[in-house]
A protein has these predicted regions:
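PLP-dependent aminotransferase-like
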Residues: 108-165
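Conserved PLP-binding catalytic core of the aspartate aminotransferase-like
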Residues: 142, 286, 295-329, 352
Length: 366
């Protein structure tokens, strides 16, 4: 990223110039303040910094094309994604966010006789899409280490789709790469493994890996990605999946024609070409997250080891009153997850937002 774009990005974010190292979160003594009318939003695992400057410019320029259908832009993005992952274009399908990929997978491969198996807790949308297809949803609790219990999940009979969110939402935890490989190898060919890698870019553990390179060997593997997280485009909706062509064809049968919009396609294309934005975003998130975790631990709370842009705090008390009290203090945190009723999910925002979070959290939990 050149110096001009660094200055522009810093000004847009309102936090000064982008730097390789940032000042400690809690070294400053000035009182925190809310950055947004209505409170600080740490509830949806969004990227507080937004898209890269190049992506924002591309989306602005694409407004001149909104009178045209998106066919050419779709083809261009598919080509870029295929090249990125070293597959042919017929291995790629686009979606309005990775949520549409989940919906297409449920529609194509689950039914009243083919179940959807998922962890508990995990991202709930897959269960909703499965029920819309008339499929039974089987929930398997996470292990004590907050990993997917893949052996139990694979053992569910008549499974049409097994959904694995890795890193997992809402726990920010990972499932070991060796266990994932063994799981994929053990599945019958008529059971689809849908691996959701929405938070892939934030994971840096040596025990984690993307399974996209395994697609060529696994005819029953679908891998979902999104532009909503590290790329900062949650509001514009764009995602994709990688799978073998036979699966892509079945998913395309469930997809609306020309469902993508040219603005999102332009932003996604530019985002994939701006690798510096990803590197800087990961660095910012990691440093801010680590300092927040340290502050929370100093208050005596356990935090699930995080490989994402959010954390899960074990409050050892019912979480609903804390959620409500945090909101009353101007900080919106994650929703209640019934499988973990004493855990609080918190998105990692900007350093200033997280100072406000720590102050409010200390007050609420005192």
């Amino acid at each position: 990223m050149n110096e001009l774009s660094r200055r522009d990005l810093g000004r847009l974010l309102g936090i000064g110039a982008v730097a390789a190292t940032l000042p400690p979160l809690f070294a400053q003594n000035q009182p925190p303040r809310s950055l947004r009318r209505g409170g600080i939003r740490l509830s949806a695992n969004e990227n507080p910094y937004g898209p890269s400057t190049s992506a924002a410019n591309a989306m602005r320029d694409a407004m001149r094309l909104v009178n045209r259908y998106p066919d050419e832009a779709q083809d261009e993005l598919v080509t870029t994604i295929a090249k990125l992952h070293d597959v042919s274009a017929d291995h790629v399908i686009l979606g309005d966010g990775s949520s549409e990929i989940l919906k297409l997978t449920a529609a194509a491969f689950s039914s009243p006789t083919r179940k959807v198996v998922m962890a508990d807790p995990t991202f709930e949308a897959m269960g909703e899409y499965a029920r819309a297809s008339g499929a039974e949803v089987v929930k398997v609790p996470l292990t004590s280490a907050y990993a997917h219990d893949l052996e139990k999940m694979a053992g569910v009979p008549s499974a049409g789709v097994i959904y694995v969110c890795n890193p997992n939402n809402p726990t920010a935890s990972i499932t070991n790469k060796q266990n994932v490989r063994a799981f994929l190898q053990s599945l019958p060919q008529d059971t689809i493994a849908l691996v959701d890698e929405a938070y892939f870019h934030y994971a840096d553990s040596p025990d984690y890996e993307s399974v996209i390179p395994l697609v060529q060997m696994r005819p029953n593997l679908v891998v979902a990605r999104t532009f909503s997280k590290i790329f900062g485009m949650a509001g514009i909706r764009c995602g994709y999946a990688i799978a073998q062509p036979s699966l892509i064809r079945r998913m395309n049968q469930q997809k609306a024609w020309d469902s993508m919009n040219v603005v999102a396609l332009a932003g996604a294309q530019a985002s994939l070409l701006d690798t510096a934005h990803v590197v800087e975003g990961r660095k910012r998130n990691s440093q801010t997250r680590d300092e927040v975790v340290n502050a929370v631990k100093q208050m005596g709370y356990e935090v699930v080891p995080s490989q994402a842009n959010f954390i899960m705090i074990n409050l050892r008390r019912t979480v609903r009153p804390v959620i409500d009290s945090m909101r009353a203090n101007g900080v919106h945190v994650g929703r209640l997850f019934p499988a973990l009723p004493q855990h609080l999910r918190v998105t990692i925002g900007t350093p200033e937002e997280m100072r406000s979070f720590v102050t409010a959290f200390r007050t609420v939990t005192a």
